[in-house]
Structure formats: C-alpha cells, structure tokens
C-alpha cells in the first residue's frame, strides 16, 4: 500500500473512531453531489405541485439540487447516522385502543437540538485530523437547511431510500436520524449503497395509517406563510 492510500485509510479510520466517541452509530463520506436522476425527480415533484403549501421547497429549489449550490466551497460531505430505534416493537402499542401513541422520534428531546449539539462538538474535533495542509472550513446541517440528506446518505453508503420514502439501513432499518457536515477539503469517500427493495413493499403494507405524506406537512409546517 502506497503512502497516499495508507494516509487516506488512516484519515477515514480516525474520523470513524471519533464519530463513535461522540455516540454516532454510523459515519460515511461522499462527494457533495446529487445524482442527475434525483434532481430530475425533485424537479418533477415541484412541477406537479406535489409540495402542497410547503412553498419553501420551491423557493429553495436551486440550493436543494446540489450541496455546492448551498455552499460553493464544499468538496466533501460527512454523513452521520444516530440510531433512535426503540427497545420494544411500537406496533404492539397501536393495538391498545385505550391509549394514545406518540411517534418514536418525538418521544424524547427535540432531535434537531440533540443531534446538532453532538454534530458541532464532533466537527470541532475534525480540525486536528484534517487541518494539516490548508485552512479547514465546514458547515453543519441537521434537517433544517435546503439539503437533500437521504440521497447523500445513500451515496455515502448508509442505506437506500425505501418505498415509504425513509432511508433504510441494513443494520438499523429506518431508525436513523441523519446529519451532514460539508467540508472545503477532499477526503477519501465510501462506496454508495444500492437499492435492495426490489418488489418488496412490506413497509407500505404494514403502515397502520398509510401515512406516506411527510409528517412535516401536517405538524410544524407554517400553514399561512
């Protein structure tokens, strides 16, 4: 193994070990690019007015098409996953009609705040690893910026987008919160994940409410903006 390849592997190993020390369950790296096929699907989604009253999707179309449109200096993207899977099967609670049910992701603290705090602390520790040959700059994102996290997560190898629209991980299922760090430095990337759904539609069949519309549309979205 030549020195450059060894150095690249050392960098990836250090980043992964660092991510584990902050409690992240998976950490992968990719280029800050969105495949043309995904861009075309997003354009079609907007053209057909499928975004309802979420007008900001249309307003931020250009920036969502590519992380580089969001930040022109971006050269790499670190995508991290935080497992929030429950210990018990949440579907068992649905059978108890005398009890209300809260979605698993909403049972704890606001994940945006928890995850972003972890992400910022993790990002601050990247400087000693990556800042050896030039000034390092980075941006941290958790679900609140015009960034297509799920396509980036698939490109990085965390999983693939299932028919229920969520990311599916071989190890963690659909129980991953996603966060992204964009950097102005080229670092070694991971292999993308393939779509393994095939003809399977178990995620659609098992959904008790057939709620395949983004929850954001019916919960915190501003209705009169």
Regions found by a protein language model. Name each.
Residues 1-196:
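Auxiliary alpha/beta "docking" domains used to position bulky ligands
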Residues 217-225:
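Single conserved hydrophobic/aromatic residue that forms the stacking wall/gate
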Residues 80-82, 209, 222:
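Residues immediately flanking
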């Amino acid at each position: 193994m030549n020195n450059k390849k060894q150095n690249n592997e050392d960098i990836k190993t250090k980043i992964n070990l660092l991510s584990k020390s902050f409690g992240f369950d998976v950490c992968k790296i990719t280029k800050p690019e969105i495949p043309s096929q995904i861009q075309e699907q997003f354009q079609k989604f907007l053209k057909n007015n499928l975004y309802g009253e979420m007008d900001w999707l249309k307003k931020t179309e250009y920036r969502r098409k590519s992380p580089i449109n969001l930040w022109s200096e971006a050269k790499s993207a670190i995508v991290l996953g935080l497992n929030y899977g429950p210990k018990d099967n949440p579907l068992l609670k649905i059978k108890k009609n005398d009890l209300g049910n809260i979605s698993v992701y909403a049972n704890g603290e606001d994940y945006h705040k928890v995850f972003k705090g972890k992400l910022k602390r993790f990002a601050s520790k990247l400087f000693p690893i990556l800042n050896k040959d030039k000034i390092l700059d980075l941006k941290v994102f958790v679900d609140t910026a015009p960034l297509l996290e799920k396509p980036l997560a698939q490109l990085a190898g965390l999983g693939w987008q299932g028919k229920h629209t969520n990311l599916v991980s071989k190890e963690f299922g659909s129980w991953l919160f996603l966060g992204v760090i964009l950097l102005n430095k080229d670092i070694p990337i991971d292999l993308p994940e393939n779509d393994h759904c095939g003809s399977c539609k178990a995620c659609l069949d098992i959904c008790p409410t057939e709620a395949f519309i983004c929850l954001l549309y019916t919960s915190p979205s501003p209705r009169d903006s």
